[in-house]
Structure formats: C-alpha cells, structure tokens
Amino acid sequence: MDKIHIAVGSTRRPKLAAVTQALESFGPVLEPAAEFAVLGFDVESGVSHTPSTRDELMRGARQRAESLVRLAQQRHEAWQYFVGLEGGLDTVQVDGARHVFLESWAYVSDGSVGHYGRSGGVEIPAALAHEVLENGVELSQAIDRFAGEVGIRDAQGAWGVLSRNLITRQDAFRVAVLAAFAPFYNSKMYRAASAAR
C-alpha cells in the first residue's frame, strides 16, 4: 500500500483534524489504494494574525503551502501535497453598509500547481468587527472576551461561538480543504474543462 504524505502548515488541532476528516471523504477517490499521513508544521503565513481581506486570506493560505514546499526540499522529504490554511475576515460593502464575514481558506499544492478552496462565511457582529478591525485586537482574543471563554480557537473556534456550534472551525476548514483538493481528486473533469477552452 502506498503512503501519501500531506504536509499542513499548522499544528493546531482543528486544522489538522479538518484535513484528516476531508481525506476520509475524498482519499479513496484521490488514491484508492493509499494510506494517508497528515503532518503538521508551524510555518509563517506572511500576513497579519487576523487577515482582514479576501486577498490577505488567500495570500496567507498560499504562502503557508509554499513554505511547506520549500521545507520539503530543504529536508529532502517526498511529501506529495502541501496544505496552507488561513482563517480571518472578509469585508464587503453593500448599499453603503459594511458587512464583515468570518471565512476559512485553503490552498493545496502538489509542489507544481495549486488550487484554492474556501468555506462559506458567517457574518460577525458589528461590535466584534470593530474590536478587530478598528482596535487591532486579534480575533482569537476578541472572541474569547466576547464569549467569556478561553482558548476558543483551539476548540470550536469563532465559527462555533457564532453558530452555536452548528458549524465549528474544524467544519469550516474541512469544507475549504474539500474544495481546494477538488482539481486533484476530480482531475479528469478539470482537464476536460481546460481542454474545451
């Protein structure tokens, strides 16, 4: 049985569990006879602690994956996939009103090509958005204070607090990972679509 190594740019439990859970869904399609090993590493995103734009979220996820590619080259590792995960805020103006959404993004690379995926978004309360965007408080600290708990980011995350645990941080990243891996586990369709252009 082949062993496929998937390097993840985080050591946080919800992120690693999200990748593992996503693999349970698409792994048999990606590599039918393979065993998967998820490896977590602390790598820098190159963006702020709480990204506040879609561009910053996407850049952070991609830069984490690219850091893993470089790490594999330096260590002479034969990892097959590199996963960068980034959570944060996306601000949208609609009819002059600001709406701030919590989103989770993934970027998956095989070392040559990469693809993005994201979760849905949940609108955060205006007071929480103000605390993070105007006062510069990191989201993990602000959500702990708003919820009256400690260590939320390593548990259900802001997603869980905002959705009464109907959607957790792990759930959101799982969706982002499923979406980012789609061009790999559904490569036939993606190649056909590219050829039809």
Give the location of each predicted region.
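Polar low-complexity intrinsically disordered regions
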Residues: 1-3, 196-197
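N-terminal polybasic phosphate/anion-binding patch
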Residues: 2-77
